[in-house]
Amino acid sequence: MTTPSTSNAPKTLYQKVWDAHVVATPEGEAPIIYVDRHLVHEVTSPQAFSGLKVAGRKLRAPEKTFATMDHNTSTRSASLDALSPMARTQVETLAQNCKDFGVRLYDIHHPNQGIVHVMGPELGITLPGTVIVCGDSHTATHGAFGALAFGIGTSEVEHVLATQTLRQLKAKTMKIEVRGQVTDGVTAKDIVLAIIGKIGMDGGTGYVVEFCGEAIEALSMEGRMTVCNMAIEMGAKAGMVAPDQTTFDYLEGREFAPKGEDWAEAVAAWKALKTDVGAEFDATVVLDAANIAPQLTWGTNPGQVVAIDAPVPNPADEANPTIRASMEKALDYIGLTAGTPMTDVAINKVFIGSCTNSRIEDLRSAAKQAKGRKVASGVTAIVVPGSGQVKAQAEAEGLDKIFIEAGFEWRLPGCSMCLAMNDDRLEAGDRCASTSNRNFEGRQGRGSRTHLVSPAMAAAAAIAGHFVDIRKPY
């Protein structure tokens, strides 16, 4: 048995959080790390709880486990009768498991229910320097707070429930620095899509990425969560942003954040959670924020992305035969022709929501485009707030009225049309401007065609009936 490194050499943010959580390093085996927070939902937890019951085990730390219903829930009604038989079974099973094991549950009737990666941060469950896991690939979202957060499989969910630990190999480190500031109309979603476009959907494989630079520091916590949310879409294990005053201001006073003297002590400790001067990364990527335009995907993975003022790429211009074949396949599925201006691409569906872009800042941005306008004829557009708190705040600000008057549908919280796992899905041939995180074949429904964009770009597309450059009048 070896012990964690206590070297005084400069360390990255990831190294600091990792070192603080290694509890054992068995010779010849993966290190064992401690898990501070475990988030669960109705889809990846049933088998894990069943395994505990069969083995006669209890939860190691039920107070560190938080559950919500989000993937299969209806955004039209809070009634169980609105769910499909399978969805109803899953949410009822989660409710029973939480009751049996003493887990805090935010069910469909709870005012704080919502998408797991939205309600966790807004309740203060997510804190700097913690290790957070969830049976969901977009757990990286929580890294925006300087946490080490990543998705795990169902067997690992069971292991964490039983032991509050996990075997993990240490990842390599990558620094992605976005220098300077973005121009008007460019958002966090555009930044992360530009990053993925630069390094590809597998450019971060094997790495934990730290996002930094002036453009990242200027983002709100909502924006940082958007960036970290899509770290997995570049293949990374996790994404992180060092906590700063923006982080502390967001967290102060939230339900599960430290209070009183504990708060002052926590902030003092969190201020040390930054990469030391001289710390080395295994890889570095640099982008100039001023060169980033509003982005949208043209193909069937998040790396197939261009600026709004660019045309659909031509596979013939790609020298790599493997990439060229992938581009040709994507264009065939998505139904676009090389050379077509992206502003000529018409859409008939719009989805504003998901764990990427369903927070209050996102809805304000979309509402700004929708105010005083009308959704184009033939377009169906839905707005799905990420949580009960977001919904209540948006309604207090009158955003729901702006959307409804413009012809958008205003829904209940949930994962919704991000994935074809509930009643919100696309039909074959539909073309959707979506604020979600994946544009894979069939992701939003069999035969559906998805274009990833920011909330402002999605709302503008709903109004125009096609993609537009929101930096210009339309």
UniProtKB/Swiss-Prot annotation:
The keyword Membrane does not apply. Binds 1 [4Fe-4S] cluster per subunit. Pfam families: Aconitase. Pathway: Amino-acid biosynthesis; L-leucine biosynthesis; L-leucine from 3-methyl-2-oxobutanoate: step 2/4. Keywords: 4Fe-4S, Amino-acid biosynthesis, Branched-chain amino acid biosynthesis, Iron, Iron-sulfur, Leucine biosynthesis, Lyase, Metal-binding. [4Fe-4S] cluster binds at residues 355, 415, 418. Belongs to the aconitase/IPM isomerase family. LeuC type 1 subfamily. This is 3-isopropylmalate dehydratase large subunit. It comes from Shewanella sp. (strain ANA-3). The gene is leuC.
